[in-house]
Amino acid sequence: MNEIDVDEADILVLSQGLEKTSRLTHQVNKSLAKISKTSAQSSQLFGPILARNNVLKTLQRNIDSTLNSVASVKDLANEASKHEVLLRKGIASLGLKPFTVELHKLEDMYQDMSVGNSRHTENAEFHGILKHLKEMITSSEEQLELEFIQILKRIEPFDPQINMEKKIPFPYYSDEDISQMLIIFNYFYVKSEDSRMQDIFIRERGDQMLKSMAFMEPFAKKVTSSKNAPYEKGSSGFINYTEAVLGFIANERSLIDDVFSQFAEIKPRVLRNILDPIVAAFCKVLMSDLIFVKSNIDNAGLFSFELTECISGVQKSVKGMNLKNQMQLIDADKQVKDVTRSLFKDTVDRIKSKTNQMTTIPSDNGVTEATVDTMSRLRKFSEYKTGCLAAMESISRDVWLSKSFREKEYTIQSAAIADNETAASLLSCFLSDCIDTLVANLERRAQTILMPNQEPDVANPNSARNKFKQRIGFLVLMNMTLVEQIVEKSELSVMLGNLGKARIEKLKKRYVNYLVADWKDLTVNLMDTVVIDSVGKKSKDKEQIKEKFRRFNEGFEDLISRTKQYKLSDPALKRLLKSEIVALLMPMYDRFYGRYKDSFKNPRKHIKYTPDDITNVISQTLR
């Protein structure tokens, strides 16, 4: 037996083991390859199944969502249908307040659905409901607008003249109407501060007022009955037209306060937009009348004072509103005041013209046509006191007196008139200047008639050239008597005031001095002598004294005779003249008489009057 090598044996065993392992590994690999092939086939088979399963899951979710959406839309449709049924009953059946409540609910539902619109982008039924809601809301809001308009139209255009004549207030909405308008306006304003209802309110109210004012326009544009007829105060239809405009403005203020009581911030806009066309219509009629006045200033000029009052009233009523047509009012006011101010100058020029037309002095030295015309015109001015005062604002004396006027002929100097004089003071000054102008020009014309070959010396009681002072003084004072009578019996007395009356007294004093100027010359005769004692008078001195008494007697009797001819009728003027003559004459005559009454053997031959006689004769003449 051969001996076995151990190492070879180990190698053999190991080789056999490796061979066996290799075979097993090969078999495992074959199995793994088969498994891999089978897995790939399974993956190909189950992939579509899994994908379909996922699709089915998605479809399930969509179906569930759709079912929920359909249920939700059904609920919304049912809810909307309830509100729609109520709204379709209409405002008259449902009532205005419930109608707006239901409409608000529908509006809220629409807003909620619009916000959630993204969840229903492919739901045609949802969009149909949304569209229907919008249409229903729009239709209901249109009903509200129509209701608002119908309420506004419950007041129809009317003739304001009838209401004013019957003293009936302009039509106004009932509390219920105002409450309903407030409900409607509140709905739209709360919704979006929409200005639609404001615009409707502005349009309807403006149209109603314009149509009402149109009733009065034909009468407002008629100033006088005919072109050549003088205007009578208060006769123009424009005055009532203005009263109606002021009534409309006041009415509209109250209405807007009531309707928009909860919306103070929009009141100014609404009122401004309503009144703008009203003011424009007012200005249009006013300018039509002003054109007529300018073309017929002699007959219709005084109407401009009433126009001034009318404009002033409207300006005050719309003050602070910032109207678009505010400038129209301002321009109209300026044009009217230009006319009224021209009347002041025209009046002064007219006085001069009328006095220059005087060709003879009245035979009784009485009232002249110029005086009658002047005072008639000034009395007319007094009927328009308010308009005159308005026209006097911000003007000066230069408006009616030229800068070259003779200041000495007037009873007040320009330096005495302040730059900031009140309208009342300026009006008094104007009236007094008219009277001064009348008197000064009467004197100037009288001097020209009586002394045609010399330049008149006016307003000068001491003039040596004026040989007719007494006659001229009497002429002026007789005319001033009429002036004072008219002043006292009219509003001129108030308009002149204390200063104006003082100026009249100053004028009277001037021409009383004219009347007593000859009396003053008479007293001068008594002064021209050397005063010596009666004892030891020379014969020559006595002759001079006799001559002075003779001249005095003749002069006194001549003056008394002339004074009687004038036939003064004014008691106050008589008393004033008597007082002036006595005060001027008696002190000198008393002194002269006392010194020389015993100078003659037969005093009565040379001295015809004692001081008491003189006083009595003067008193009898001027009683």
UniProtKB/Swiss-Prot annotation:
Recite the UniProt keywords alphabetically: Exocytosis, Protein transport, Transport
One GO BP: protein transport
- SUPFAM superfamilies hit by this protein: Cullin repeat-like (SSF74788)
Checking InterPro entries in the record gives:
Cullin_repeat-like_dom_sf, Exo70, Exo70_C
State one molecular function term (GO).
phosphatidylinositol-4,5-bisphosphate binding
Q: Where in the cell is it found?
A: Bud; Bud neck
Keyword rRNA-binding in annotation: no
Q: Does the keyword Phosphoprotein apply?
A: no
- Return any one Pfam family short name: Exo70_C
Q: Which GO terms describe its cellular component?
A: cellular bud neck; cellular bud tip; exocyst; incipient cellular bud site; plasma membrane
Q: What family does the entry list?
A: Belongs to the EXO70 family.
Functional note: Involved in the secretory pathway as part of the exocyst complex which tethers secretory vesicles to the sites of exocytosis. Also plays a role in the assembly of the exocyst.
Q: Which PANTHER family does the record match to this protein?
A: EXOCYST COMPLEX COMPONENT 7, EXOCYST COMPLEX PROTEIN EXO70
Q: What is this protein called?
A: Exocyst complex protein EXO70
- Species of the source: Candida glabrata (strain ATCC 2001 / BCRC 20586 / JCM 3761 / NBRC 0622 / NRRL Y-65 / CBS 138)
